[in-house]
Every structure is written in C-alpha cells, then in structure tokens.
Amino acid sequence: MAWPKLPAPWLLLCTWLPAGCLSLLVTVQHTERYVTLFASIILKCDYTTSAQLQDVVVTWRFKSFCKDPIFDYYSASYQAALSLGQDPSNDCNDNQREVRIVAQRRGQNEPVLGVDYRQRKITIQNRADLVINEVMWWDHGVYYCTIEAPGDTSGDPDKEVKLIVLHWLTVIFIILGALLLLLLIGVCWCQCCPQYCCCYIRCPCCPARCCCPEEALARHRYMKQAQALGPQMMEKPLYWGADRSSQVSSYPMHPLLQRDLSLRSSLPQMPMTQTTNHPPIANGVLEYLEKELRNLNLAQPLPPDLKARFGHPCSMLSSLGSEVVERRFIHLPPLIRDLSSSRRTSDSLHQQWLTPIPSRPWDLREGRRQHHYPDFHQELQDRGPKSWALERRELDPSWSGRHRSSRLNGSPIHWSDRDSLSDVPSSIEARWQPSHPPFRSRCQERPRRPSPRESTQRHGRRRRHRSYSPPLPSGLSSWSSEEDKERQPQSWGAHRRRSHSPHWPEEKPPSYRSLDVTPGKNSRKKGSVERRSEKDSSHSGRSVVI
C-alpha cells in the first residue's frame, strides 16, 4: 500500500510543530524598574515549557552594574558605548562585577533564599515573580530570571531586569524635606507674629524687619485685657474714680486717672453715661474706652466744698492711707520766772533775746528718733555741759571771773549761779510784757536747750525716752525730785521763793492735757497715754504734735 505524497509546505509544518511546542520560552513584563530606598517592588517573570511544572526550577540571580546608569551616565565612556549601540551598564564579564543568588524554587515548594539574603523579606510568588520588601542600598543592579526545565534544551532560558535604586534621590529628598520643614516653621512663625513668637528674630519671609515689633506686641496684650474686661463692662455701670475695688473701673487702665487715695475715697459716685448699643467685637470695646477717656474732663475744677476740704497738699500721714488724718497743734506756754534787778542783763542781751527764732514743731518723729537712736541722745548729753558753759560765758561776762575764782579756791559751782541763766529769758519777758504783748506768743514756740542736770536725769531714767515731750528748758527747775530738794542748801530755797513768778504761785506749774485720743481705742490704753502725757507734757515749753 502506498502512502499518499504530502506537499512540501505541509511536510515542513509537521516537522516544525513538535520542535516549537517542546522548546522553553521566558518573558518579563518590564526590563527596567526604578525604586526608592525602603520601598517594596515586584519583578514580573513568566515562562512556557513542555516539561512538568514540578520539575521546573526558577532561579533569580543578582549582578551589579558594570557602570552606574545614574552617576556614570554623563561620562565620556558611557556616552561612547551608547553611540556604538552597546549597554555599558551590563556589557561586561561576570568576573568584573558582583554576582549573587537571590532566591531559588523547585516546582511549588518554598523558595530558598541566598546566603546574602537570609535576613531579608524576599520571596517568589505566582510562577516566577520576585517580591522584594524594603529595598536596600545594595539592591541596585541587574536581576536575571532563569528557568530550568528537563527535556527542553532549546529556546531562551533567562531574561534580565534592571533595578535602579534611587538612593541618592532619597538623600536629596531628606535634605529638601528638612529645608522645607524649616521654611514652613519660619513662615508659620511670621504668620503667628506677634502673638506667639520670640522678639528680635528675623523670619525668611520678612528679613528686612524684626519678627515681633514691640508696638504690635503691646497692642495685642492690650486687646487681650480689653476682651477680658469687656463682658463685665457691659453689665455694670462705670464710676469715675470712685469704685476702687471693682475691676470695671477705668482707674487702673489709664495713668491719667490716678488720683490721691484720700481724695478718691471722699469723691461722690457719679455714674457715667453709657451707650446702649455696644459693638460685639473687641475693637469696638477698645474704641468705646478711648471715647470715654477723651470725653473725661480732667481739667474741670472741683466743687467749692471739696476745695475747702482738700485745699491743703497731701501730708506724709495722710498719704499713708485712704483715711484723712487731722492734725492738731497744741502749744504749751514756756516756764516763766522772775529775775532780780541786780541780775538783769544789758540792752544788747535784751535785743538778742527779742530776735525771733523760727519755731520748729516737736512732732512725733523727734520722739521716735530719741527712742530709736540712743547714740544721738548720748552725743547730746556729752555736748550739753560744754555748750551750756560757753553760752553762759557769752551772756554774762562777770560769770567767767567768778567761775575761775571758784575753781581756784576748790569750791564747787553753786546751783544758784547755774540756774541764773534759766531766769534771764523769763525776767526779760516779764519786763517786756506790758509794752509788747505779742512777745509771749512768739516765745512760746521757741525751742529750749536741755541742761546738763536734766540730761543726766533722763540718762538715768530710760523711761522718759518714750515720752513725746521735749527736754527740760533749763538747768534746775521747780519740779525737781524730792532727793534733789533734800540735797539743796537752805539759801537756795529762800532764793527760789524770791525768784518765783507772780503768775504761778505754786511750786509746780499747771499740767496740760495735750493728747487727742483717736476714737475706737481701748479705754485702758487711753488712760495710760493720758497719764504719761500729763507727766511729761507739763515739763515742756515746746509745741507737741499729736
């Protein structure tokens, strides 16, 4: 039996089909991929074979670039290879670059990672796709997908994929991101000015001026205060300088409204005219306050009754508190004694005593100074006898001779001579009084110098330092203690009786109660103060301020 002859094309087709169906074919989707650091990427790879799938072995190999396609792209050698139609990044032997096995899988088994990729998150999925999680710096290179199928010896068993890792771009992005962050902070800093930024820092958006001007910062703080005081001002009426405890008063907000505390405490409350429609925003509140301050007439004179009460300037006592302190001057007359006609001084001495001396009120501050400064008091005691002797020598020239002769004889100084000086002003006053009555009033406020004996008595008795009365006027007065009277000679008593003033028949002068006790104090305390004032103020010829 003879087989029919087949035409030549059919014979060629039948010969080619078994060979084409039994060959191996590998394909890739992208031949070049770009990725950044720490990103994930999938390299696609597929194949066709006539062998069994469980016998197919898929292997991914890594080969580094011969020349870097990023950094060496603009070099002369790289451009010359491109002009010749070559690939300078991959056209080199394997001994000139690094070659590593990434992963390998047989059939449907689990992939096995290479030695250099054991700690990496790399796997093979689907038929031959390579998955790389967290791309590193050294993953930059060429990846080869190789398929090994038993029985298929023909065809193209591998394909290459270029993986370009933009590590340099990542570094640039990090630097640019930091610069953008700083720029953003600077812009926000300028936009928030002057509320939240620090002064004297120049921003990039406004380098010609300061970031925080002081005027804008003060305006912002003032607006904050006005917003905080706005709701309270809408509810309560405003009082001009009368409500000190209220926060709605305009006194602490404007320095021109500051007055004396004593004056403000007694001013009547005058409610100011308040508009009914208030603007809801903070700028309106500020404008309202400025308008009220402009309408306030500070130059308007006070009423006549207030002028009469507050015409005098503010004293030291009244400035310490809001209460008006009333001061009272109590003038005590001096102690007057007559002097015999044989002891009277000349007309020059008479004119010297008639010279008016400006009076200085003996106020509470001098008493406190004597109490708190004993050194000053001791200096006054040490200086007392010497200054008294000099004044006695000036007033009575004959006394210096008697004093010198008495010292040569060894006899002590008589108290009658020592007391003669204290009688001079009183006798002159007694002689001058009929023709010149005002002399008594002028002499009442003249301060007296303390005598040595009185200074010694006050040095021995420290209690008198707490008194508000001035020191004693002369050497030995009529109110000496009983011990001093016993030690005095009999002639002194007779002389004292002759030198008494006709105005005071008694030995002791009348006592003066010169204490104005503040109401509301304790009665026991008032009694003690009165007794001490009666004891000490009767010894004084000065003015006492209570």
UniProtKB/Swiss-Prot annotation:
Keyword Ligase set for record: no
Intracellular or extracellular location(s): Cell membrane; Cell junction, Tight junction; Nucleus; Cytoplasm
Boundaries of every Ig-like V-type domain copy: 24-162
Primary location group: membrane
Disulfide bond residue pairs: 45-145
Ranges per topology, Cytoplasmic: 189-546
Regions that span the bilayer: 168-188
Signal is among the record's keywords: yes
Modified residues (Phosphoserine): 499, 501
One of the protein's GO biological processes: regulation of RNA splicing
Membrane topology: Single-pass type I membrane protein
Protein name, per record: Immunoglobulin-like domain-containing receptor 1
Lineage: Eukaryota, Metazoa, Chordata, Craniata, Vertebrata
